[in-house]
From Swiss-Prot:
Residues 29-50 are annotated as: NMP. ATP binds at residues 10, 12-15, 95. It catalyses: AMP + ATP = 2 ADP; ATP + H2O = ADP + phosphate + H(+). It is an enzyme of class 2 (transferase). Keywords: ATP-binding, Kinase, Nucleotide-binding, Ribosome biogenesis, rRNA processing, Transferase. It comes from Archaeoglobus fulgidus (strain ATCC 49558 / DSM 4304 / JCM 9628 / NBRC 100126 / VC-16). This is Putative adenylate kinase. Belongs to the adenylate kinase family. AK6 subfamily. HAMAP family: Adenylate_kinase_AK6.
Length: 178
């Protein structure tokens, strides 16, 4: 079974994946698999460009694949980690990214971009709001989903997180000023 651990940068994917690996799970990153299968197209501005379609066609991995593109690999299960954009902004500030890249990622989180893509590519999709959870709580939620725990799968079914409605008052106020 192929399980994608995905989400906007800063939601906790790498930290969760590292701990799951320590607990004995078979974990790989999208970049590791792309290197193994010769699916790296280019490196632009220090970022690796991956041919995701080729990788999805060639992948023979059984386990957890971590990365913000992992849900595009046609996984059996996609677990999308989410984070309130206000908190996510603080998490991403320390990454020395341009304001443009920061805003692009915040916008993607607000608009559910990765969740929507996961729903298009994965057989089963779950979403976990990591905003106020400890790392251990997130890991426990991920493990429960992997185990097939019915309560966890019900609790983390997609559609429960809506950042835009939380910001609705602010958006309306802004629109009145325009």
């Amino acid at each position: 079974m192929l399980i994608a651990l995905t989400g906007t940068p800063g939601t906790g994917k790498s930290s969760v994946a590292e701990r799951l690996r320590e607990r004995g799970y078979k974990v790989a990153t999208v970049v590791e698999l792309a290197e193994k299968h010769g699916c790296i197209i280019d490196e632009e501005d220090g970022e690796i460009v991956i041919d995701v379609e080729s990788l999805a066609a060639r992948i023979d991995f059984e386990g957890i694949v971590e990365g913000h593109l992992s849900h595009l690999l046609k996984p059996d299960v996609a677990i999308v980690l989410r984070c309130n954009p206000a908190v996510l902004r603080e998490r991403l500030k320390g990454r020395n990214w341009s304001e443009e890249k920061l805003l692009e990622n915040l916008e993607a989180e607000m608009l559910d971009v990765i969740l929507v893509e996961a729903l298009e590519h994965a057989s089963e999709v779950y979403e976990i709001d990591t905003t106020e959870m400890s790392l251990e709580e997130v890991i426990e939620a991920v493990e429960a989903i992997i185990r097939g725990d019915r309560e966890a799968r019900k609790r983390y079914k997609p559609g429960g997180i809506d950042w835009l409605s939380e910001l609705e008052d602010r958006i309306e106020e802004f629109m009145r000023k325009v």
